[in-house]
Amino acid sequence: MADNDRDGWDPASGVGLSATEGAAARAVVGRRKTPLVRDPFAEPLVCAVGVDSLTRLAQQSGVDGESGFAIPRMVDWIAARTRFFDDYFNAGQTDGIRQSVILGAGLDSRTYRLPWLPGATVYEIDQPGVVEFKNETMDRLQAQPLADRRPVAADLRGDWAPPLRIRGFDPSLPTMWSAEGLLPYLRAEDQMQVLDEISALSSKGSRLAADTVDDIGELAARIALSRGPRNPVAESDADLGGASSSHAVAQRLQSHGWLSNTRPAPQLFAAYAMPPLAEDQELYRKITVVTAMLR
């Protein structure tokens, strides 16, 4: 992540724009004939951000519903990734875990749309500007969380554990951690620090799910080349963080006692019955989802 981004961002600036583009993709997915996921808050949140180009993306539908996004098949990828993380949280609940932490929550609306079981508490960590925006927007939409939602305003590149504890996080309880669309925007050293902190805060039986990119430079280059009309997300994506590989992430977790597993993105496309990748969509083979459980 570029040094000039160390001061933070909101959904309309910096890397926050990429979270807004992801929400726009979820809005498009929801209008498909048989949507893989339904996020009724995606379009209202994007519209509230107020970036015209992203609002237009969110309001697309039909055969042209993927035009203008960062890379080909991005809507399919966001659909598959979103469903994967939805399934991850639902499975953890079934196994009795009631404490969840969403790292880099952005415009994630899971606390409002997943079928949380009684006693579920969800901590949403993100930059102060992002947290303030989502709190105000969801209040304006009169949206009601389906779990005990506890937003935490903190920078994940700094000391975020104390603010999390202040909000009531209990390290003695098993936790479901998620880092969806986060790690590629952190520098390698910041990634490792986040993984170390997660491990220090986790008890036996805790789980983690995260997506990684093995060649962040190629991703940034492909995004720049694939853009159509001028889009503000292009400039924020140029500051992708030079992140660690999925292998490095898995190794770090294993060093802390986690049992990890990796799945390349094409496996998710197949698992959710999506069309196979074309030759010019090989970039997705460098995107991996890492899951882990603390033994």
UniProtKB/Swiss-Prot annotation:
Family matches, as SUPFAM superfamilies: S-adenosyl-L-methionine-dependent methyltransferases
Cell membrane recorded as keyword: no
The name this protein carries in UniProt is Putative S-adenosyl-L-methionine-dependent methyltransferase Mvan_0910
Q: Which organism is it from?
A: Mycolicibacterium vanbaalenii (strain DSM 7251 / JCM 13017 / BCRC 16820 / KCTC 9966 / NRRL B-24157 / PYR-1) (Mycobacterium vanbaalenii)
Keywords from the UniProt entry:
Methyltransferase, S-adenosyl-L-methionine, Transferase
The record ties this protein, via Gene3D superfamilies, to: Vaccinia Virus protein VP39
Binding of S-adenosyl-L-methionine occurs at: 126, 155-156
Q: Listed GO molecular functions?
A: methyltransferase activity
